[in-house]
Structure formats: C-alpha cells, structure tokens
C-alpha cells in the first residue's frame, strides 16, 4: 500500500520504555543494569538503521551504583589516566546513532565514584528533561578566605558552601 513520510518515520522510530527493562522509578533499587540493557537494545536497533527514543517514567527517581557500573578504558584530563586508565561509567552510550533519551523530568542519583555519563563513538544523541546528582560528592567545594604562615606550616581558613555536609574526624 501507499505510505506517507509519517508512516516511514513511525516505522523507523522505536520507543523503548525503561520500565520494560525492570528499572525502578521509585529509587529503591539500582537501575544501572536496566538502563544499560535498554541502551544495548537501542544499539541493536540503531545497527538496523532505526532511530530510538529511550523513555524514562515521568518524574522518576533512579539509582545507579558503582557496583553495577560498566568499565572502560577512558583517558580524561581531570583524572590519573596513566596509572588508572579503567573507569566505572554509570550510563554508557556507545556506538549508537539517532538516540533520544527522554527523561520526562526524572532524576538519577549516582552512588559511588564513577563517570556519570559517557557518550562515545555515537552520533545524533539527545538528552532531554533528565537531571542527575551524586549521593555523596567525591570532592568538596570551598572558598579560601585567609592564608597564614607560621614557620614551616601554612594554615588555610576556608568557608564551605552551605549545601556541603561534612564532619571532621580523627
């Protein structure tokens, strides 16, 4: 039969729902494996020439932990890539073309020291309406407002940003 441009687009665009891959939109369980399974399916569809939209649930809260993160050798400017070239990656988009990640105002909380999102050897990748943060920051920002020298010692007085949680132990 006769096909319009819209019909051709509809057949070549596939929507993958994250919930179909057993992701937990309530933030109780780690969704890292589910997200990566969905991205593996997206890659397979991409290899067939299809465009893919990966759909998060509306206003979801997703956890991604270091324990289930993928590993890749990555050289970046802000890490020790010579001694530690292998990095954990929370969400890895690799070798995919024509992917839209529709977050639907969802939020990912990354737990553990890892690269949060890596897009590698991919083309035409869009990320919409998705935010993320870390459960515990691996670095802390502060402002130094005074430096004192006493003999061979240097003392810094700093002011932490109000949103930083901290404790000094010893």
Where does each model-flagged region fall?
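Right-handed parallel beta-helix
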Residues: 114-170
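A residue-level signal for beta-strand positions that form part of recognition/binding surfaces
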Residues: 13-15, 53, 124
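N-terminal extracellular ligand-recognition/capping segment immediately after the signal peptide
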Residues: 21-26, 36-39, 43, 48-99, ...
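Short intrinsically disordered, low-complexity coil segments enriched in acidic
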Residues: 1-5, 41, 156
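Extracellular, surface-exposed passenger/stalk and repeat segments of large secreted bacterial proteins
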Residues: 1, 7-8, 133-136
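Right-handed parallel beta-helix/beta-solenoid
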Residues: 3-35, 60
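Short, intrinsically disordered, charge-balanced linker/junction segments flanking boundaries
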Residues: 10, 100, 169-170
